[in-house]
């Protein structure tokens, strides 16, 4: 999990900047052999702010995450859970 410290900090910073209920932001890391899944949980009222119109904000966050994770040659996926 140390390998993903920067990615986790980046996602938490971005998400907490967008939501109203910062204390309900939870990020769970599930590590696989070649990929890692980051499960993001936010308040039900803040899910729309994270996804954005037509998924634009979620896509932008995933793009930043992919660029940050490219250094480790592993795939990192972001799942937004309600």
Swiss-Prot record:
CDD domains xrefs: KH-II_YlqC-like
Protein location: Cytoplasm
GO biological process: cell wall organization; peptidoglycan biosynthetic process; regulation of cell shape
Signal peptide start-end: none
Residue span, KH domain: 35-82
Protein name as it appears in the record: RNA-binding protein KhpA
Family that this chain belongs to: Belongs to the KhpA RNA-binding protein family.
Keyword annotations: Cell shape, Cell wall biogenesis/degradation, Chaperone, Cytoplasm, RNA-binding
SUPFAM superfamilies linked to this entry: Prokaryotic type KH domain (KH-domain type II) (SSF54814)
GO annotations of cellular component type: cytoplasm
InterPro entries assigned to the protein according to its UniProt record, in alphabetical order: KH_dom-like_a/b, KH_sf_prok-type, KhpA
Species of origin: Borreliella burgdorferi (strain ATCC 35210 / DSM 4680 / CIP 102532 / B31) (Borrelia burgdorferi)
UniProt GO molecular function: RNA binding
Entry function: A probable RNA chaperone. Forms a complex with KhpB which binds to cellular RNA and controls its expression. Plays a role in peptidoglycan (PG) homeostasis and cell length regulation.
Gene that produces this protein: khpA
Description of how the protein assembles with itself and partners: Forms a complex with KhpB.
Pfam family, one: KH_KhpA-B
């Amino acid at each position: 999990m140390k390998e993903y410290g920067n990615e986790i900090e980046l996602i938490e910073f971005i998400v907490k900047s967008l939501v109203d209920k910062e204390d309900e932001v939870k990020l769970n890391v599930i590590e696989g052999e070649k990929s890692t899944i980051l499960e993001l949980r936010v308040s039900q009222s803040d899910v729309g702010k994270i996804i954005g119109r037509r998924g634009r904000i979620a896509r932008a966050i995933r793009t930043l995450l992919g660029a940050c994770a490219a250094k480790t040659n592993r795939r990192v996926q972001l799942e937004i859970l309600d």
